[in-house]
């Protein structure tokens, strides 16, 4: 039996996952992080994107988070997400539409244009699409 670590994924809406996992892969500010049992303690920001859990037995589960924090302790990994959704529940067509709308907003700047908000919408839509693609790859 493979070594495991307890993982919790929570958001303001509540807990979406709690259980033993063999590996957690998340998208941090400096790139992807792979957390396995015995990983050094750390706290880091998470960018919008997929979180992949490899559960006992090798089954994988993918979630989308809109950002948050990752805390690693010797026997525990905790993801504190702004919002979290199971990747299977994401609507790819809606994410594509949001991506196009964000790109159009960036290209059609008006006098009251908020570049930061438009860039954030673009990044979130792109992260949702990346999550859907990762889910498809894993099947």
From Swiss-Prot:
Q: Which UniProt keywords apply?
A: ATP synthesis, Cell inner membrane, Cell membrane, CF(1), Hydrogen ion transport, Ion transport, Membrane, Transport
Protein origin, superkingdom: Bacteria
Q: Where in the cell is it found?
A: Cell inner membrane
Q: How does it sit in the membrane?
A: Peripheral membrane protein
- Gene Ontology molecular function terms on file: ATP binding; proton-transporting ATP synthase activity, rotational mechanism
InterPro entries in alphabetical order = ATP_F1_dsu/esu_C_sf, ATP_synth_F1_dsu/esu, ATP_synth_F1_dsu/esu_N, ATP_synth_F1_esu_C, ATPsynth_dsu/esu_N
Entry GO CC: plasma membrane; proton-transporting ATP synthase complex
Q: Which NCBIfam families match?
A: ATP_synt_epsi (TIGR01216), PRK00571.1-4 (NF001847)
Family under the similarity heading: Belongs to the ATPase epsilon chain family.
Q: What does this protein do?
A: Produces ATP from ADP in the presence of a proton gradient across the membrane.
Q: What is this protein called?
A: ATP synthase epsilon chain
Q: Which organism is it from?
A: Pseudomonas entomophila (strain L48)
């Amino acid at each position: 039996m493979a070594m495991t670590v307890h993982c919790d994924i929570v958001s303001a809406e509540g807990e979406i996952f709690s259980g033993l996992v063999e590996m957690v892969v998340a998208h941090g500010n400096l790139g992807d992080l792979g957390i396995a049992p015995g990983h050094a303690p750390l706290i880091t920001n998470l960018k919008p994107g997929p979180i992949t859990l490899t559960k006992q037995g090798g089954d994988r589960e993918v979630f989308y988070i809109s950002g948050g924090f990752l805390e690693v302790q010797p026997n525990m990994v905790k993801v504190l997400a702004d919002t979290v959704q199971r990747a299977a529940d994401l609507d790819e067509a809606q994410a594509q539409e949001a991506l196009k709308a964000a790109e159009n907003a960036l290209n059609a700047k008006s006098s009251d244009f908020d570049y930061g908000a438009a860039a954030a919408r673009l990044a979130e839509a792109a992260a949702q699409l990346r999550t859907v693609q990762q889910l498809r790859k894993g099947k």
